[in-house]
Amino acid sequence: MSFEVKTTPHFEREAKILAKRYKSFKADMKDFVESLEKNPMQGDELSPGIRKIRLAIVSKGKGKSGGARVITYTICASESEGRVYLVDVYDKSDFSTASVSILKKIISEQGII
Protein backbone atom coordinates (compact mmCIF):
# COMPACT_ATOMS: atom_id res chain seq x y z
CA MET A 1 0.00 0.00 0.00
CA SER A 2 1.18 3.49 -0.80
CA PHE A 3 -0.73 6.08 1.19
CA GLU A 4 0.51 9.63 1.69
CA VAL A 5 -0.20 11.12 5.12
CA LYS A 6 -0.92 14.87 5.27
CA THR A 7 -1.83 17.12 8.17
CA THR A 8 -4.40 19.90 8.33
CA PRO A 9 -3.82 23.26 10.07
CA HIS A 10 -6.45 22.30 12.68
CA PHE A 11 -4.58 19.07 13.46
CA GLU A 12 -1.25 20.91 13.73
CA ARG A 13 -2.71 23.37 16.27
CA GLU A 14 -4.13 20.59 18.43
CA ALA A 15 -0.96 18.46 18.13
CA LYS A 16 1.19 21.40 19.25
CA ILE A 17 -0.87 21.67 22.46
CA LEU A 18 -0.46 17.95 23.19
CA ALA A 19 3.27 18.06 22.36
CA LYS A 20 3.75 20.75 25.02
CA ARG A 21 1.83 18.68 27.57
CA TYR A 22 3.43 15.27 26.84
CA LYS A 23 7.16 14.93 26.11
CA SER A 24 6.84 11.69 24.11
CA PHE A 25 4.01 12.93 21.86
CA LYS A 26 6.19 13.79 18.84
CA ALA A 27 7.90 10.38 18.86
CA ASP A 28 4.54 8.65 19.40
CA MET A 29 3.08 10.54 16.41
CA LYS A 30 6.06 9.62 14.22
CA ASP A 31 5.50 5.92 14.97
CA PHE A 32 1.77 6.37 14.41
CA VAL A 33 2.26 7.97 10.97
CA GLU A 34 4.56 5.11 9.92
CA SER A 35 1.92 2.55 10.90
CA LEU A 36 -0.80 4.62 9.20
CA GLU A 37 1.11 4.63 5.90
CA LYS A 38 1.12 0.83 5.99
CA ASN A 39 -2.46 0.38 7.22
CA PRO A 40 -4.69 3.44 6.69
CA MET A 41 -7.87 1.50 7.53
CA GLN A 42 -7.05 0.97 11.20
CA GLY A 43 -9.37 2.24 13.92
CA ASP A 44 -13.14 2.68 14.06
CA GLU A 45 -15.05 4.11 11.11
CA LEU A 46 -17.30 6.96 12.28
CA SER A 47 -18.63 7.88 8.84
CA PRO A 48 -17.52 6.95 5.30
CA GLY A 49 -13.86 7.95 5.08
CA ILE A 50 -13.67 9.31 8.65
CA ARG A 51 -11.89 7.11 11.19
CA LYS A 52 -11.06 7.43 14.89
CA ILE A 53 -7.81 5.77 15.91
CA ARG A 54 -6.51 5.28 19.45
CA LEU A 55 -2.97 6.50 20.10
CA ALA A 56 -0.95 5.58 23.18
CA ILE A 57 1.06 8.45 24.66
CA VAL A 58 4.05 6.82 26.35
CA SER A 59 4.75 9.69 28.76
CA LYS A 60 1.12 9.66 29.91
CA GLY A 61 1.48 5.99 30.91
CA LYS A 62 -2.13 4.94 30.30
CA GLY A 63 -1.85 2.93 27.08
CA LYS A 64 -4.17 3.33 24.11
CA SER A 65 -7.38 3.40 26.14
CA GLY A 66 -6.34 6.48 28.11
CA GLY A 67 -4.18 8.13 25.46
CA ALA A 68 -5.15 10.33 22.55
CA ARG A 69 -7.60 9.96 19.68
CA VAL A 70 -6.59 10.80 16.12
CA ILE A 71 -9.29 11.56 13.55
CA THR A 72 -8.35 10.77 9.96
CA TYR A 73 -10.05 11.27 6.60
CA THR A 74 -9.01 8.82 3.89
CA ILE A 75 -9.30 9.36 0.15
CA CYS A 76 -8.53 6.22 -1.84
CA ALA A 77 -7.32 6.56 -5.44
CA SER A 78 -7.24 2.76 -5.67
CA GLU A 79 -7.10 -0.16 -3.24
CA SER A 80 -3.38 0.39 -2.72
CA GLU A 81 -2.98 4.17 -3.16
CA GLY A 82 -4.47 7.30 -1.66
CA ARG A 83 -4.17 10.06 0.89
CA VAL A 84 -4.82 10.08 4.60
CA TYR A 85 -5.49 13.47 6.17
CA LEU A 86 -4.86 13.90 9.89
CA VAL A 87 -7.87 16.05 10.76
CA ASP A 88 -7.94 16.25 14.56
CA VAL A 89 -6.22 14.90 17.65
CA TYR A 90 -7.43 15.17 21.23
CA ASP A 91 -6.58 13.82 24.65
CA LYS A 92 -9.07 11.20 25.82
CA SER A 93 -9.13 12.82 29.27
CA ASP A 94 -10.23 16.16 27.71
CA PHE A 95 -12.98 14.81 25.43
CA SER A 96 -14.69 11.45 25.59
CA THR A 97 -16.06 11.40 22.05
CA ALA A 98 -16.02 13.39 18.82
CA SER A 99 -19.19 14.52 17.06
CA VAL A 100 -19.35 13.37 13.43
CA SER A 101 -21.14 16.56 12.36
CA ILE A 102 -18.38 18.72 13.87
CA LEU A 103 -15.71 16.55 12.23
CA LYS A 104 -17.40 16.89 8.83
CA LYS A 105 -17.49 20.67 9.33
CA ILE A 106 -13.76 20.73 10.15
CA ILE A 107 -13.00 18.61 7.06
CA SER A 108 -15.00 20.89 4.77
CA GLU A 109 -13.44 24.03 6.32
CA GLN A 110 -9.98 22.62 5.60
CA GLY A 111 -10.91 22.27 1.92
CA ILE A 112 -10.50 18.49 1.80
CA ILE A 113 -14.04 17.77 0.56
Task: Walk through the language-model features, giving the residues of each.
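Arg/Lys-rich, positively charged N-terminal/basic patches that mediate binding to nucleic acids
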Residues: 1-29
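Alpha-helix C-capping/helix-to-loop hinge sites
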Residues: 14-18, 39, 56, 90-93
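Arg/Lys-rich, often Gly-containing low-complexity segments of ribosomal proteins
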Residues: 57-68, 72
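Enriched for short, Lys/Arg-rich terminal
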Residues: 68, 73-113
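A short, surface-exposed loop/turn module that caps and links secondary-structure elements
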Residues: 37-61
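Compact soluble domain cores
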Residues: 24-42
